[in-house]
């Protein structure tokens, strides 16, 4: 498994984005991926997400499917701004 830290600009605030992300969880799980952690900037204009996946290509193969793009956009995500920051090998959540 690979853990990637990703950022995305959002336009409808944290709560709307968070509801959308939680709604996508079952579909992500079907393809062996899940959100481990997510947080937003103080002005709620961007989110940072730690995603567990089988392969980094998941970001494109899943995140850019037309149906998934429509769901993400409805949740306020600027899909074109999706940016992988780095692979994360170790982390803890207290």
Outline where the language-model segments fall.
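Short S/T/G/P-rich N-terminal loop/turn motif that feeds into the first structured element of a domain
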Residues: 1-94
């Amino acid at each position: 498994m690979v853990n990637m830290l990703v950022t995305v600009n959002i336009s409808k605030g944290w709560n709307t984005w968070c509801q959308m992300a939680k709604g996508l969880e079952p579909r992500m799980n079907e393809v062996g991926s899940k959100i481990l952690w997510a947080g937003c900037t103080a002005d709620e204009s961007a989110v940072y997400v730690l995603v567990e996946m089988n392969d980094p290509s998941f970001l494109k193969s899943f995140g850019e499917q037309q149906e998934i793009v429509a769901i993400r956009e409805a949740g306020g995500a600027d899909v074109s701004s999706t940016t992988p920051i780095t692979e994360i090998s170790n982390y803890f959540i207290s």
